[in-house]
Swiss-Prot record:
GO molecular function: unfolded protein binding
Alphabetical UniProt keywords: Acetylation, Chaperone, Cytoplasm, Mitochondrion, Nucleus, Phosphoprotein
Pfam families: Prefoldin_2 (PF01920)
Organism of this sequence: Bos taurus (Bovine)
Protein name stated in the entry: Prefoldin subunit 4
Gene it is expressed from: PFDN4
Positions carrying Phosphoserine: 125
Keyword Mitochondrion: yes
Signal peptide start-end: none
Subcellular location: Nucleus; Cytoplasm; Mitochondrion
Subunit structure: Heterohexamer of two PFD-alpha type and four PFD-beta type subunits. Interacts with URI1; the interaction is phosphorylation-dependent and occurs in a growth-dependent manner.
Gene3D superfamilies listed in its UniProt record: 1.10.287.370
Function: Binds specifically to cytosolic chaperonin (c-CPN) and transfers target proteins to it. Binds to nascent polypeptide chain and promotes folding in an environment in which there are many competing pathways for nonnative proteins.
GO biological process, one term: protein folding
Amino acid sequence: MAATMKKAAAEDVNVTFEDQQKINKFARNTSRITELKEEIEVKKKQLQNLEDACEDIMLADDDCLMIPYQIGDVFISHSQEETQEMLEEAKKNLQEEIDALESRVESIQRVLADLKVQLYAKFGSNINLEADES
C-alpha cells in the first residue's frame, strides 16, 4: 500500500496555467470538431437531396413542365432547364461549403495532434485525451 502511495506521489505533475490553457483549448477544439462533423453530415444530406432532385427532373419527359423551386419561404415556378441550372448552382455552392468545413476540421485536427503531443509529453498516462466511443 505504501509503495503505491509513493508511486502515485512520484507521478504527480504540477499543472501550470499554460498547461490548463492547453487542456481547455484541446477540449474546445474537440467540441468544435464534433459540431463541424455534424454540420458536414447535414450538408451532405442536403447535397444528396439536390442530386436526387436533379435526377428526377432529368427523368421528366415534358419540356414544357413548370417546376416549383423554393427560394427562401416561397416557391417560384421555372422551366425544366432553368430549374436544372439552379439546382446545379446550389449543388456547387453546397459542395464548396462542405469542402470549407472539411478543411476547417483538418486544420483543427492538426492543432489537436500538436496539443496531444505536448500534453502527453508532460503528463504521460496521467491524462486521457482520447475521445469516448460511446
